[in-house]
């Protein structure tokens, strides 16, 4: 990947385009979206553009894995003490974000397989069975994301108990419900954090397989001469 990225500097106009984009990002408050008519998209030659798609989409897959793994720490922390965001709401939101990462990975993987086919025509790489394996491995997460997107918010018995015990703690202070609420929340978030860590490790394994397959099918532009 690094070798290919460095090779782009030999493309006429690319280094200048990158510098101009960095300037626009740095000074975005002072500039129009496209100052002086500068193009916002760099046009590579078709072959280089297809190779560039492979690299950028691979990096997007890596970013999705990193985002899914970071959910472990969202589960571990409740940063809204004293604010109008309940523990129940925070936990539900993080669960939904976590599930969404697996759908995101699957959809990006489909797009990535198309980029591989375009950049390396005639290769014998078939992502179909691999995507099916991914769908089977993460079936629970993908089903939960589908349910959230099309029907209702995510909940389970533990999260529902956090919601109810929180209501009772507010309405019946000193009756033991606050301790019950906090204990259930700590136990449940610990379990979710562990799940995020374990599922993140499985995503890492999938990325290793993708990297090996990519190097095999795209060795003509992803190896160092």
Each language-model region and where it sits:
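A glycine-rich, hydrophobic loop/mini-helix early in the fold
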Residues: 51-92
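Extended amphipathic alpha-helical scaffold segments
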Residues: 26-32, 38, 68-79, 109, ...
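Secondary-structure edge/capping motif, primarily at the C-terminal ends of alpha-helices
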Residues: 72-87, 116-119, 152, 217, ...
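A structural signal for well-ordered alpha-helices, especially hydrophobic packing surfaces
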Residues: 58, 62-65, 69-72, 99-102, ...
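Flexible secondary-structure boundary motifs
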Residues: 95-135, 151, 155-156
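Short N-terminal signal/transit or membrane-insertion segments
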Residues: 3-6, 81-89, 95, 103-105
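Acidic, Ser/Thr/Gly/Pro-rich intrinsically disordered interaction regions
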Residues: 1-55, 125-225
């Amino acid at each position: 990947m690094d070798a290919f990225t460095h090779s782009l500097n030999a493309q006429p106009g690319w280094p200048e385009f990158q510098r101009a984009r960095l300037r626009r990002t740095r000074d975005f408050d002072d500039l129009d979206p496209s100052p002086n008519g500068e193009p916002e998209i760099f046009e590579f030659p078709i072959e280089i553009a297809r190779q560039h798609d492979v690299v950028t989409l691979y990096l997007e897959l890596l970013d999705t894995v990193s985002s899914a793994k970071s959910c472990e720490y969202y589960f571990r922390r409740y940063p809204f003490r004293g604010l109008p965001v309940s523990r129940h709401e925070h936990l539900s939101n993080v669960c939904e974000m976590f599930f969404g990462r697996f759908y995101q990975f699957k959809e990006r993987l489909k797009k990535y397989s198309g980029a591989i086919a375009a950049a390396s025509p005639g290769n014998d790489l078939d992502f179909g069975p691999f995507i099916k394996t991914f769908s089977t491995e993460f079936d629970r997460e993908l089903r939960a994301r589908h349910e959230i997107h099309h029907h209702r918010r995510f909940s389970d018995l533990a999260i529902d108990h956090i919601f109810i015990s929180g209501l009772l703690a507010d309405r019946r202070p000193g009756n033991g419900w606050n301790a019950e609420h906090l204990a259930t929340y700590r136990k449940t978030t610990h379990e979710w954090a562990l799940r995020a860590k374990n599922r993140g490790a499985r995503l890492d394994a999938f990325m290793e397989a993708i990297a090996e397959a990519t190097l095999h099918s795209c060795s003509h532009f992803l190896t160092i001469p």
